[in-house]
Curated annotation (Swiss-Prot):
Organism phylogeny: Eukaryota, Metazoa, Chordata, Craniata, Vertebrata
One Pfam family matching this protein: Ank_2
Function recorded in the entry: May be involved in the initiation of hepatocyte growth.
UniProt-listed PANTHER family: ANKYRIN REPEAT AND BTB/POZ DOMAIN-CONTAINING, ANKYRIN REPEAT AND BTB_POZ DOMAIN-CONTAINING PROTEIN 2
Gene Ontology biological process: cellular response to toxic substance
Keywords in alphabetical order: ANK repeat, Repeat
Full protein name: Ankyrin repeat and BTB/POZ domain-containing protein 2
Biological source species: Mus musculus (Mouse)
Domain BTB: 844-913
ANK repeat intervals: 521-550, 567-596, 606-635, 649-678
Recorded GO MF terms: protein heterodimerization activity
Amino acid sequence: MAGTYSSTLKTLEDLTLDSGYGAGDSCRSLSLSSSKSNSQALNSSAQQHRGAAWWCYSGSMNSRHNSWDTVNTVLPEDPEVADLFSRCPRLPELEEFPWTEGDVARVLRKSVGGRRLPSFSAEAVRRLAGLLRRALIRVAREAQRLSVLHAKCTRFEVQSAVRLVHSWALAESCALAAVKALSLYSMSAGDGLRRGKSARCGLTFSVGRFFRWMVDTRISVRIHEYAAISLTACMENLVEEIRARVLASQSPDGGGAGGGEVSAEALEMVINNDAELWGVLQPYEHLICGKNANGVLSLPAYFSPYNGGSLGHDERADAYAQLELRTLEQSLLATCVGSISELSDLVSRAMHHMQGRHPLCPGTSPARQARQPPQPITWSPDALHTLYYFLRCPQMESMENPNLDPPRMTLNNERPFMLLPPLMEWMRVAITYAEHRRSPTVDSGDIRQAARLLLPGLDCEPRQLKPECCFSSFRRLDARAATERFNQDLGFRMLNCGRTDLISQAIEALGPDGVNTMDDQGMTPLMYACAAGDEAMVQMLIDAGANLDIQVPSHSPRHPSVHPDSRHWTSLTFAVLHGHISVVQLLLDAGAHVEGSAVNSGEDSYAETPLQLASAAGNYELVSLLLSRGADPLLSMLEANGMASSLHEEMNCFSHSAAHGHRNVLRKLLTQPQQAKADVLSLEEILAEGVEESDTSSQGSSEGPVRLSRTRTKALQEAMYYSAEHGYLDITMELRALGVPWKLHIWIESLRTSFSQSRYSVVQSLLKDFSSIKEEEYNEELVTEGLQLMFDILKTSKNDSVLQQLATIFTHCYGTSPIPSIPEIRKTLPARLDPHFLNNKEMSDVTFLVEGKLFYAHKVLLVTASNRFKTLMTNKSEQDGDSSKTIEISDIKYHIFQMLMQYLYYGGTESMEIPTADILQLLSAANLFQLDALQRHCEILCSQTLSVESAVNTYKYAKIHNAPELALFCEGFFLKHMKALLEQDAFRQLIYGRSSKVQGLDPLQDLQSTLAERVHSVYVTSRV
């Protein structure tokens, strides 16, 4: 027993006190951790020694019955397995999700490298859209728990949640997608209100709908827009990853170029066989990792020590070393262990390997990574003991220790194999929790959080904001420095206990900075007291001389655990974040700056103000208090020099309240009087000042109670943008009622929301307001989305007022320019006879019978005129020989046929006089006999005589008789006169009636295409 205890103690000492699992002086370094698998490289002699030397090489592998027994266990076909999963808690079934099946289909149709990819069946799309919900819920639940710490969800919480739920490979892919989307969003800051968030990020899924979904599910009381962008990008990237894997399985060469449609069965087969996808897409609350649907454990290629493509720097490495790497790979798949020493050794060796293969963090430049290399992650003793509690196996424990007899009876049921995650997943999740805390040490709390995620039926509270001292970070300090740090930790603990009578002793223990001492997280005792809402402690610390406006510093070796989003926060910020109004009142009374760190405004020290945080949370009392103390709602719109800035990622207070749907807070902010500051204009605003002043003054007198300053107008327009993006229609309309001018994108989003909610009174109001949008705003979005939306309304609405408003908009968009005229076809007939031979029996060699009357003609002219006449002549000769030369023509009147022949004999239309009543019939005959020039001439004559009464009939003729130019002209005529045409039953029957569909007509689609082309050419292309 003493030997066992000594071995365990030595292993724990190596694990917790060694220099970082992979440092250069480590006693157990794996120099060959980058070598590839030896499954193909090892020769037969090495295979023969598998049973001898291999097991003796590693200290954790010297037992007959160890963690290897759990690696390749074959799952028995037990009928209770299905029942086992049926008893596991399931994820909630939500009614709404931020995407539609159409959105998923569009992502699947996106081309890759210009290659056309196979399509997915409708059932496969429906199935995938449903499976994605589970992945979203998992990520959202983890982000929700991580957001408890600061009562705010940022991109850091979302990215950590993705890393918790997904494998290393998928998480890195999602992180890169998020970085790309955020970069595109930042680079398009100049298009702020002109384009939607998704368009600016290059995403198909709607960022606005994701933000609204995050608010509705209360992931946090504050959602940062970067968090919504990151989550949207990650979910879209997951669809693309699944598509790539499905297409790779369909293609023989793995390139995804296989033909045919991807079925739902093929999709499910790929997911069931993929250990990185199957568990994430299951309906159970606990996360199944590292296993596929068959229960087969697998190690992701990202972590495998054998996927480097080469044997490393020493290709002559002996077989034993390569087998050691293979041993490590298999050991990471262990689901239980027999002793704490075995677990310690496995974790130690795995950390050595991970330290040598630490990837570059997405979004971090190599230069910055070199300046600030990631700290090596260590494991505290309590973390190992907690992990062993979840991984211990009584049977293996008895076999490991010969002095320990197995119990005759057990009081606890063992977890079935299917519910046991491999060691690799325990480590991955625990390390992710530690890295999110910016801690260099995995502690027992990280293991408990991992157990909650990986095992069914377990739960624990999220981590709270409190002082955390990392003792392992003291290892490199000398005795004196370590003593000071231990005393500092003692001081924080004394203050954190809530006893005000210990303040003087605690301050003395904190060190030379006293009450303003900062811990590893960059926080002072006052900040912790404010976050906890301990009013008595806050008062005592203020009396002790605590600095009220000291800020959380940036990350540094002295403060290694600073959360990136908490930089430059003050004590007031923490009190506002956690909603402690009495503490906020106390701090303000004591002289804390109401704007937080904005007192030292600058790009490097920029942070959200307390008023912004209170506005985002919708805390009406806090907002009122801060406003009464002089907080400026427009502070984020200006930098220290008064210049407007679009470089910061933060929004103004109006935008925060509007983005989260807090209408009462927005109204309270609007009651704040406008400060009389001189507006600083950009060059563009200076050039447009004259026009804008007249517009603003007219709007201010008629639509708003007061004239808005230019700065407040911009702030409210930004708030209007966010409310429209996130679907808060009432807020958008209320801001419009104040006189805030429309932007085209805001108007389109508002119209879409009102239409989807069937609020036709708002639809009518929006349509009526379209004329207030400047024509300079018309862009590609109007062509691709706005017109589509308005024609959808036209198809479904039965409200005459709405239809009349739509007609007015279509006419306005078409413009006052004339309809493009139909061009003539300049075509000379191949043969020509003197008009004297028209219907002349002399020298005639063919006779037509039309309406019982004979018409004489000449073959030489007709055969060369069109293929239709040539076919008639040929067929008649073959059927009747030369005995009969009469060809009967039906469905054409005699005088129409005579005008047709007149065109042929005259050689053109110059000498022809066509009565208006006969134009359409002649057009039909010209189309029948394939006389293009005559048909085009008839089209031109029709366009010249087109009227509101004849337009519908002419359009039908043009469609039936294949006259596209005339049909296009009619569509332009419809758009120019739609308001009058809607009064006619014939036109309504054309666009709404079933007869149009029976005839193969889709006039609304044709009108939309014509108007889109017109708007694009007049308003979009002409500006380029």
